[in-house]
Amino acid sequence: MSQIIDVPETLSLAIDSFLSYIEVERRLSPVTVENYQRQLMTIAQMMVAIKINQWSLLESQHVRMLLAKSHRSGLQPASLALRFSALRSFLDWQVSQGMLAVNPAKGVRTPKSGRHLPKNMDVDEVSQLMNIDLKDPLSVRDRTMLEVMYGAGLRLSELTNLNINDIDLQEGEVRVLGKGSKERKVPLGRKAVEWLQHWFAMRELYSPEDTAVFISTKSGKRLSVRSVQKRFELWGVKQGLSSHVNPHKLRHSFATHLLESSGDLRAVQELLGHANLSTTQVYTHLDFQHLAKVYDAAHPRAKREKS
């Protein structure tokens, strides 16, 4: 069992100030702030272990030593890069605040991690997942969540944070507040619109306590991230899918299927809410009207049924 090392205020106070800055001024999500806190407190504990109790005493050789120790402990390259990124951003902030003269992490490199193509479901598997037995309102709610997640390519947090006034059923659009509090509009697709209409007709039966689109049928409160993950996993098993079903996989499937059909990487980037095109390029083997046109022509569940 590893020993818990107390972090002195000479290290922790600066971390607390930085966390307040990224939460209030940069408006980063609670999950991101928590990740920063975890990484920086781990680094601070490692510094205490080598007798460094002030950030001003940290030098480049110490940064390399901390990274090497993290690597030896079994930290994978991607996780190591995340830890180093948190440290570098934190030290950059200290420089901007006049707390440090230079950033000791500048010029230090971490092992490169290869980017792997995210796993996704094929169109037949998506259809199998969606074809659920609608015996009760709970099933209707879950079917609607699945359709919206796949139809709009949302992040899990974006799905759970949706409010009624974010949905425009007439236009078939959803307003999403993504990473860094950046707002974007995304087409929903015909199937998602139809199922939202079904769910909205039932939602009021559960005395919703707030404006959340997706609520618990027991409490009427907004569904948590973990609750959605459990429901998606449950339906994957019930529908006999061989691979594990999770919200992220549906988002990846949305991106892959749309890119395969349209070849429009830039449009997919905008729909996913990626700040950098390089993030979207992992799926490779504008204005809103243009995005909607690409979506309507390419997405499997946006196409009109033939009469």
From Swiss-Prot:
Keywords: Cell cycle, Cell division, Chromosome partition, Cytoplasm, DNA integration, DNA recombination, DNA-binding. Pfam families: Phage_int_SAM_1 (PF02899), Phage_integrase (PF00589). The active site is at 155, 179, 248, 251, 274, 283 (o-(3'-phospho-dna)-tyrosine intermediate). Its main location: cytoplasm. One of its GO terms (cellular component) is cytoplasm. Forms a cyclic heterotetrameric complex composed of two molecules of XerC and two molecules of XerD, in which XerC interacts with XerD via its C-terminal region, XerD interacts with XerC via its C-terminal region and so on. PANTHER family: PHAGE INTEGRASE-RELATED (PTHR30349), TYROSINE RECOMBINASE XERC (PTHR30349:SF81). This is Tyrosine recombinase XerC. The gene is xerC.
